[in-house]
A protein has these predicted regions:
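Bacterial N-terminal signal peptides that target proteins for export
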Residues: 1-9
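C-terminal motif of bacterial Sec signal peptides marking the signal peptidase cleavage site
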Residues: 18-19
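Catalytic-loop region of hydrolases
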Residues: 23-90
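Short beta-strand element of the alpha/beta-hydrolase
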Residues: 72, 87-105, 109
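Loop/turn elements at helix/coil->beta-strand transitions in domains of secreted/extracellular proteins
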Residues: 92-96, 138-143, 182-184, 223-227
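Cap/lid segment of the alpha/beta-hydrolase catalytic domain
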Residues: 99-162, 203
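Alpha/beta-hydrolase active-site loop
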Residues: 155-177
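Primarily recognizes the serine-hydrolase "nucleophile elbow" in alpha/beta-hydrolase
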Residues: 173-250
Length: 269
């Protein structure tokens, strides 16, 4: 093969790869909430059936980088579609519980309401409602966003907080189209997720993120939340590293431990 043909082949391959990359990211999404795309679900909590509509895997930006994570699961108590009330809340007044599943600043898919085994107990033992299911049973609308994270090339900072802000903007943009009061969004997370939840509250409408949000095609408007629920938020990473060094000083033996991504069950192998 002569030099010209080799050059043409290289250019063709490069163009082909570029075209494939564009196919993966070229699709744009509508940010209007679709009321008809749901499933009806019911889970028993304390002897009572908690019935709700599940709107899952909803892309919350027009130009997502990764649709594995830039999606949100929305759950609405069925009573709100029949003019009902739960603990004094209605379709117009119900707060929106926004729990993220972020751990270790890694990518996180949206969460779901479920009955789960308590930490340290066997899988076949007694199960309790998780936070999302508990919130539903109390009349909250639940919206659990996914977010990109540090183990992916597309998840470097500030990707995670930008994704959470975009999810909040999606809910506010669709406030009139869905049950729940988007002025009463309560963000929730644990550990790194708690840190991201705290950051979401502290950086409300911060202009430094605007270009990132525009690049994703996030809905315009505010990303302010009403309240933050942050469990053991790990925010001061430099001092945390020093604390680990102090705590484990002189500990030189290591045994591998596997920790599952969402339920943090420790398994020594």
């Amino acid at each position: 093969m002569n030099t010209l043909n080799k050059t043409l082949l290289s250019v063709s391959v490069a163009l082909g790869l570029n075209a494939c990359a564009n196919v993966q990211t070229a699709k744009t999404y509508d940010l209007d909430f679709s009321k008809q795309k749901y499933t009806e679900q019911s889970i028993e909590v304390n002897g009572q059936a908690v019935k709700f509509r599940a709107y899952e895997n909803v892309v919350y930006v027009r130009n997502p980088v990764d649709t594995r994570y830039e999606i949100i699961n929305i759950y609405v108590p069925e009573a709100y579609y029949n003019g009902g009330e739960i603990d004094g809340f209605t379709a117009e007044t119900a707060p929106i519980f926004l729990p993220n599943q972020i751990g270790g600043y890694m990518p996180a898919e949206p969460g779901k309401p479920a009955l789960e085994s308590k930490r340290g107990e066997p899988e076949d033992g007694q199960k309790s409602p998780n936070a999302a299911l508990t919130a539903l049973s109390k009349g909250y609308v639940v919206a659990s966003p996914g977010a990109r994270g540090r183990t992916e090339s597309t998840g470097k900072a500030p990707a995670a907080i930008v994704d959470l802000k975009a999810a909040v903007r999606y809910l506010k943009a669709n406030d009139k189209a869905m049950p729940g009061d988007a002025e009463k969004i309560i963000s929730n997370g644990t550990s790194a997720g708690g840190a991201m939840s705290a950051l979401l509250g502290a950086t409300a409408d911060q202009k430094d993120y605007e270009n990132h949000l525009k690049a994703l095609g996030a809905a315009e408007g505010s990303d302010k939340v009403f309240a933050v629920s942050a469990y053991c938020p790990i925010t001061d990473l430099d001092h945390a590293d020093m604390a680990y060094e102090w705590q484990f000083n002189g500990v030189n033996d290591y045994k591998k431990m596997n920790i599952s991504m969402l339920d943090y069950r420790v398994k020594r192998e």
